[in-house]
A protein has these predicted regions:
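Conserved catalytic-core motifs of GNAT/GCN5-like acyltransferases
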Residues: 108, 124-141
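Conserved active-site alpha-helix within GNAT-family acetyltransferase domains
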Residues: 86, 111-129
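Conserved GNAT acetyl-CoA-binding A-motif
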Residues: 98-108
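Short glycine/proline-centered loop/turn elements that form peptide/ligand docking sites
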Residues: 89, 113-115, 133-137
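Acetyl-CoA-dependent GNAT
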Residues: 3, 11-78, 95, 99, ...
Length: 154
């Protein structure tokens, strides 16, 4: 993640109801730092999205343990709803598999976000829990996808 990519990501604005994904309070310097767990998704030299790995993928109120690596992400707003999400997420997960070799990936998705839920389920994620966030009271789904040892590279 470069400082320029991080600065661009925090300006992205999604239409309602997806505006809950706007990163209005995020600090570009943190997103660009090595400790943030953020990685840019770049296609032909153009920033198209990002993936995060670690605590950023968790929502306050969810029941999380260390049995899976949390991952979150976003697609540039003008690219959403065009059928690109599945490939973007799959590419990010492949990177995460190579980089971190987790036993499982875990995603937390807003319950209203049927597009994202459909995509992650098509990628092998299975529902394990639902909860209400501590802030705002929105409903979220937690889904997990085990990673077979044979597919891990570390």
């Amino acid at each position: 993640m470069t400082p320029a990519y991080a600065a661009a990501i925090v300006t992205w604005r999604y239409p309602p109801p997806y505006d809950c994904y706007d990163m209005t309070d995020a600090k570009p310097a943190f997103i660009a730092s090595a400790i943030s767990g953020f990685f840019a998704l770049v296609d032909a030299g153009e920033l198209i999205g990002f993936r995060s790995f670690g605590a950023d993928g968790q929502v306050p109120g969810g029941d999380y343990d260390d049995s899976a690596l949390d991952t979150g992400g976003g697609l540039r707003p003008d690219l959403t709803g065009k059928g690109l999400g599945r490939q973007a997420i799959a590419t990010g997960l492949e990177f995460g598999r190579r980089e971190f070799a987790p036993s499982a990936f875990r995603v937390t998705v807003a319950s209203f976000n049927e597009r994202a839920l459909r995509v992650v389920r098509s990628l092998g994620f299975r529902d394990v829990a639902s909860f209400l966030a501590l802030t705002g009271g929105s409903s979220f789904e937690i889904l997990v996808r085990p990673e077979p040892a044979a597919r891990q590279t570390r």
